[in-house]
């Protein structure tokens, strides 16, 4: 099925794409990263629950298959288009109104640091309707409240269909509180991001 025309238009005009996931989301993130080319003209931010040494592993795999620049976020990095940013382990990643990232060492949220909620909520304040956020597979509810705040601030919000998620708790939590404007199967997510 072709993606909703309104959703496609919002994707084309968005400045930033937020991707959040935990257990079971690595495969879909890997496929998403392969879709992007330098002409994307968007900032892509991935927040995934991971261990500290995980970046070198995913960086290698993603870099081999991505045509866009990819880097782990450092404090006060400027958000650039045509770049894929990965939230670092053991920090919460904030998006600041100055167009920079901030790293925060406060307590874990949903037993997670980085927390998807923290990043999504900060993006909601800055990017509002210029943002698209997708919440993927995960084994806890991190990201649901952040997705709701994004939706309430005008962002386009998507949850992976729980039937497709390896771990359905994260997208199901977002759907249950009305945070997901769109609920898309995995192939629909790929089609949207390919347009």
For the regions a protein language model found, what residue spans apply to each?
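Conserved acid/base catalytic micro-environments in cytosolic active-site loops
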Residues: 1-195
């Amino acid at each position: 099925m072709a993606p909703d025309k309104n959703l496609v238009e919002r994707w084309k005009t968005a400045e930033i794409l937020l991707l959040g996931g935990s257990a079971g989301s690595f495969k879909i993130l890997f496929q998403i990263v392969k879709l992007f080319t330098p002409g994307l003209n968007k900032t892509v931010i991935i927040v995934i629950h991971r261990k500290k040494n995980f970046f070198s592993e995913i960086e290698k795999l993603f870099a081999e298959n991505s045509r866009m620049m990819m880097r782990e976020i450092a404090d006060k990095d400027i958000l650039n288009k045509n770049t894929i940013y990965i939230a670092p382990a053991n920090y919460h990643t904030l998006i600041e109104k100055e167009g920079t990232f901030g790293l925060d060492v406060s307590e874990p949220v949903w037993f997670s640091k980085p927390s998807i909620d923290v990043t999504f909520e900060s993006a909601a304040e800055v990017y509002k309707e210029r943002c698209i956020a997708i919440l993927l597979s995960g084994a806890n509810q991190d990201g649901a409240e952040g997705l709701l705040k994004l939706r309430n601030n005008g962002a386009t919000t998507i949850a992976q269909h729980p039937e497709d998620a390896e771990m359905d708790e994260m997208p199901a939590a977002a759907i249950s509180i009305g945070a997901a404007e769109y609920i898309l199967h995995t192939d629909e997510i790929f089609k949207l991001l390919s347009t």
